[in-house]
């Protein structure tokens, strides 16, 4: 589940750091790509939930999950796993709108954290 304490901490970008050989330029590109693609994936997830297309919802949640690990928010990955499992197994579907809204609200916090991380990385260029 989403760990609210991590919302006010700097992101753990160790995965990106390792993957990029500590290249600030590459990490900035990955952050920019995340911020460009994620809203599209989230919109697809929301549309599938509203339309009650549970197979699609499970697929979109699954697609977003790994990207959260890249930016150091493994905790939110667990929240998406809950959404994916509920959609795939057709369980607790009445909780789906609430669970989606919690994730959507979290993403706004994550974007702020990514902006802060990017600003720190830009100092290294």
Which residues does each predicted region cover?
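Amphipathic, coiled-coil-like alpha-helical segments
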Residues: 2-9, 35, 67-82, 89-125
């Amino acid at each position: 589940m989403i760990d609210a304490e991590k919302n006010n901490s700097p992101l753990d970008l160790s995965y990106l750091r390792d993957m990029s050989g500590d290249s600030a330029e590459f990490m900035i590109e990955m952050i920019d790509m995340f911020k460009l693609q994620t809203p599209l994936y989230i919109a697809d997830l929301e549309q599938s939930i509203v339309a009650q297309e549970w197979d699609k919802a499970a697929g979109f949640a699954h697609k977003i999950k790994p990207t959260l690990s890249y930016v150091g928010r493994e905790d939110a990955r667990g929240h998406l796993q809950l959404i994916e499992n509920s959609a795939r197994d057709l369980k607790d579907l009445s909780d789906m709108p609430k669970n989606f809204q919690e994730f959507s609200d979290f993403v706004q916090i994550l974007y702020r954290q990514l902006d802060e991380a990017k600003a720190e990385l830009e100092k290294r260029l």
